[in-house]
Structure formats: C-alpha cells, structure tokens
C-alpha cells in the first residue's frame, strides 16, 4: 500500500459523514511521505519544534505548536508519543511512530476525540508494523 493510500483511506476517511480537514505522514527528518491536498505548507523549524517536544515533553506548552503558521494551544498528550493542540473549534493531533509523524488537523463538526482516534489508530498500526 502506498503512503498516499494511508492518507486517503485511513486519515481522510469519513466518520459519521465528517472527515479531517487535512492530514499527512512525514518522516522524522521533516520530509513529506504523503499528504492531503489541503495540508498546509510548513517550515522545517515547525517540525523540529514538534520533534523536540516529543523528545522533551513540555517544550511547546509555553509557546504553542505552530504548523503552517497556525498556532495551536498545546493540551494533554502522551509524553514522547502524542501531542494534541487546540485552536478555536478545531485542532491538531500528532502521533510519533518509530520512523514517522502522523498529523491530523480537524475542525467542527469533527470532534477532538474523533481526530485522536483516526491519527492514533494509524500510528499504532504503523508501530506494530515496525514503522
């Protein structure tokens, strides 16, 4: 299965008629493995800051998580594994696997819990596959 199929079929899937606004699978070097057409252009330093927070949890809390120039307030996550952020009625979930970052961005009517489930389910599957 191609990385694009993982984005199209597993991340941008319908949940009760709703879907993520944007999604991507990135290498931990910041390279794009696959992304939805709606995924924002991002800066390398934004990915570096996400990776730093995954290595040293709490570093993004004071400044917020930035992706594509959009600032998300960092909320609860799982140290070293998941970062969750909120902006207005939407937000972001980032799941770290052995080799990749799975990123999902959502807005209402999709809920934070649905975004978390979509992103983390694929991340857990890839971890089980050694990826």
UniProtKB/Swiss-Prot annotation:
Pfam family of the protein (one): Profilin
Gene3D superfamilies: Dynein light chain 2a, cytoplasmic (3.30.450.30)
SUPFAM superfamilies, A to Z: Profilin (actin-binding protein)
InterPro entries, A to Z: PFN (IPR048278), PFN_euk (IPR005455), PFN_sf (IPR036140), Profilin_CS (IPR027310)
GO CC terms of this entry: cell cortex; cytoskeleton
UniProt keyword list: Actin-binding, Allergen, Cytoplasm, Cytoskeleton
Subcellular location: Cytoplasm, Cytoskeleton
Domain of life: Eukaryota
Molecular function as annotated in GO: actin monomer binding
The protein's role, per its UniProt record: Binds to actin and affects the structure of the cytoskeleton. At high concentrations, profilin prevents the polymerization of actin, whereas it enhances it at low concentrations. By binding to PIP2, it inhibits the formation of IP3 and DG.
Subunit structure: Occurs in many kinds of cells as a complex with monomeric actin in a 1:1 ratio.
Similarity annotation: Belongs to the profilin family.
Protein name in UniProt: Profilin
Lineage, highest ranks first: Eukaryota, Viridiplantae, Streptophyta, Embryophyta, Tracheophyta
């Amino acid at each position: 299965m191609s990385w694009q199929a993982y984005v199209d079929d597993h991340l941008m899937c319908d949940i009760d008629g709703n879907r993520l606004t944007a999604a991507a699978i990135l290498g931990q070097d910041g390279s794009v493995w696959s992304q939805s057409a709606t995924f924002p252009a991002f800066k390398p330093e934004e990915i570096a800051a996400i990776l730093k927070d995954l290595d040293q949890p709490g570093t993004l809390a004071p400044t917020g998580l930035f992706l594509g120039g959009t600032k998300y307030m960092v909320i609860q996550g799982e140290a070293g594994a998941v970062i969750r952020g909120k902006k207005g009625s939407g937000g972001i979930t980032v799941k770290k696997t052995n080799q990749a970052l799975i990123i999902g961005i959502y807005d209402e009517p999709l809920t934070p819990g649905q975004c978390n489930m979509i992103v983390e389910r694929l991340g857990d599957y890839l971890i089980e596959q050694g990826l």
